[in-house]
Amino acid sequence: MNVEEIEKYLEENFDKLPEGCKQCVKGGKLVLFITGICNNNCYYCPLSEKRKNKDVIYANERLITTVEEAIEEAKLCSSKGVGITGGNPLLKINRTVKFLKALKKEFDEFHAHLYTTPETVNEENLKLLKEADLDEIRLHPTKIFNEGYDEEYIKFLCNKLNLCNKYIEDVGVEIPAIPNMENEILKLAEAIDGIAKFMNINELEFSEENYHELEKRGFMPKDDVSNAIAGSEETALKVIKEFKGDLFINYCPSVLKDAIQMRNRLINRAKNVAKPYEVITEDGLLLRGIMIFDNEDDLKEMAEILEENEIEFEIIDKNICLNPFILEDIIEEMKRQRFPITFSAYISELYPTADALEVERIPLITKKLKFRRRR
């Protein structure tokens, strides 16, 4: 599915989506990675080395340690809700409840959904989650995709889903679209129909961590520009087409996460964190102009010129940061006047995230070129 097809699908099915998905698509969810600890060892797990099996907390891309930092990140992103993930959040139930309660207290009508596995679902944990006002829970039946379909495990899963229904308003199942597992996924859908409200099927993707495990099982990228796996989308769409029950099945392709959900979340954050001189792109990235000086006197003189002309700028690490388009105008004017200040310059494109990851540098020529003719 391309972006246009996804947008059409969302337009036609938006009202049917779980509330967590509705907000996620709009970029309105804080992604709270509560721990990397997990009892499962799924071969398709996409977590990076810095997160997998590490007891760390991230609010979106930001490494945090406190509730206050999570609240701050939610405000910076204008978040309307939170998706609590891991690892397995229920292995750190007290921490999960602490953060959930704090976010619910800080924000009005703040929707919360949580991902976990049926093995860690029990009455005690569910009571704590209900008290913390969890709105939605999604169970990932890992055993089916690691060991194969098993009727006893499906009964176990259904019992856990029924238990969740006693405490949590919206209960669903979240799975990967493993190529050629249509029959197993269809049987799973039939088993949970009438128990779960929805089943979310994610397109399977390569990551640095799972690449070798997926490759040795014969999986291949579907094209040269995507991390998605060939056959994964076809499996998901075939399941949706062939399922005849009442359960709502939603397919979440990788391009939706990158081109729509992530983009919307970046735009939300960029609007709150962009400095006066930075430009927000249509993809939610930030553009800034950078002037680099070897001579401190040149830096001071340029700063004085900018101040005299009431141009917004900032000095960071002996570099001047300013509006990229104004920088281009300044360079052209200085070339025309043969201004004696010496510097190099470029336009920086970066994420509006806590790590301010730079994705591109566009060098700018700051001096007139001199051409010589051969004689």
From Swiss-Prot:
Q: Which UniProt keywords apply?
A: 4Fe-4S, Iron, Iron-sulfur, Metal-binding, Oxidoreductase, S-adenosyl-L-methionine
Q: Name the Gene3D superfamilies for this protein.
A: Aldolase class I
The record, for PROSITE patterns, names: RADICAL_ACTIVATING (PS01087), RADICAL_SAM (PS51918)
Instruction: Give all residue intervals belonging to the Radical SAM core domain.
Output: 23-246
What positions does the entry give for S-adenosyl-L-methionine binding? 44-46, 87
The residues listed in the UniProt record as binding [4Fe-4S] cluster, with positions renumbered to this chain, are 38, 42, 45
Q: What is this protein called?
A: Putative glycyl-radical enzyme activating enzyme MJ0021
Q: Which reaction does it catalyse?
A: glycyl-[protein] + reduced [flavodoxin] + S-adenosyl-L-methionine = glycin-2-yl radical-[protein] + semiquinone [flavodoxin] + 5'-deoxyadenosine + L-methionine + H(+)
**Protein's organism:** Methanocaldococcus jannaschii (strain ATCC 43067 / DSM 2661 / JAL-1 / JCM 10045 / NBRC 100440) (Methanococcus jannaschii)
